[in-house]
């Protein structure tokens, strides 16, 4: 952790460029050119490709001369309107927008691993990620299901969760980028206990241990007393009971169709979804792209946009940067206290 991540100094955040064939470059350019208020809360630099960013700046009507290559985070001046880039690998400026490319997939992974190395060396306090494309990443031979799993590997952690957030709502996911069939298999006692501990430690670190963690039922009607499946009674309910016995305020399982409307209305601040679409579908129905994706369980804060690469509009300069701005704001907010989040999570889950 850098000395900037203290109450009196702003944190240093690395923005990874994502897939260069997607909208990552242009939303990064728009954020850094048009939202200088962010620089009062964080020192911002990009890990990616300077030439690609120069193209993106030009596409959105800016001056490509604003892009400057730096060698280390310490060189970042954070001046208004500046785009300071740590060049990670060869230029991919020749990659056409809107097309799947192994080169772009490889680059997107390289930007993340470079940022993780900077974090491990204590040179940055957090990572903000523009979207990568899973198909392109796989074309390049990187078989990670997504950003979250790649980051967990880079930091050597086994217990982590993808968390969607908007305002004061945090939706943890017990499983993420696997088939629904596999997700049901993965909702086992060990995983549910681990995610409950992770969510509880996160709530405690935020000073909200008095807010219960609500667990969504896996089956319709949370199983309806075993009529629609036994997992809720045999796996989820015992995990909730154990969490309460350990001092983690928890509730559930609660039928998902009741829980998520209640959460949106403010009854629940911390929710655990059993599988990807159980959490993502209601969240995006309400918040659209006006939310962020936080990875809880890493030693540094990582916040991402909650949308994809949008190949259909890439390179046209029309993509909205709102979610990336929200991600940077949330990372800047969480970074100064993230050490407590990490230590609390590690002590309760074993990493």
Curated annotation (Swiss-Prot):
Molecular function terms, GO-annotated = metal ion binding; NAD binding; oxidoreductase activity
> Can you quote the record's cofactor note?
Binds 1 divalent metal cation per subunit.
Keyword match DNA damage: no
The organism's place on the tree of life at top rank:
Bacteria
* List of residues binding substrate: 147-148, 284, 293, 302
Instruction: Give the reactions, separated by semicolons, that this protein catalyses.
Output: 4-O-phospho-D-threonate + NAD(+) = dihydroxyacetone phosphate + CO2 + NADH
Binding residue positions for a divalent metal cation: 177, 221, 276
The record's similarity note reads:
Belongs to the PdxA family. PdxA2 subfamily.
Provide the protein name. Answer: D-threonate 4-phosphate dehydrogenase
Q: Organism source for this protein?
A: Bordetella bronchiseptica (strain ATCC BAA-588 / NCTC 13252 / RB50) (Alcaligenes bronchisepticus)
